[in-house]
Amino acid sequence: MKGMKTLSQINLKQLPLNFCKCGVTGWCLEVIFPSTESILRQDWRVMGQTSLLMFPIYGCGALLGPIGDLIDRWVTPGSGFAAKKADLAIRHGFLYMVLIFVAEYFAGSLLRGRGMCPWDYTGRNTNIDGLIRLDFAPLWFATGLLFEQITKKKGG
């Protein structure tokens, strides 16, 4: 399929840099999102915070793009069908959203078991085991696509 990467074309040398890009971007999002919530509450201190533990969790977002490419190869192998960019964005957005939910749930479970989980959604209407919030689905959809964009090789 034109434009799709093969396994050998996924540049593993870029993975450490992309891991850092996603880790730092995730940290920034963790600070910005609560800051906007504080503005809505008219708390003009505009506070936001994150945990050092979140860096490797967000860093794993570097794997989303390669996973999306592999899924694209699997869904339409050799069909010659060139998917529209909007269709790919929707497919990838939903895929990344689900993968982020799964990663958040399992990372949270592991951290909670060690008394180190920096988040607890208990008491929120859409939480599952206090580890994920289903109302974050649009945020994870967009975050996955953002990670895909910031880790894409320029010109490719």
Where are these regions (language model features)?
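Aromatic-rich, lipid-facing transmembrane alpha helices and their immediate juxtamembrane interface loops
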Residues: M1-G156
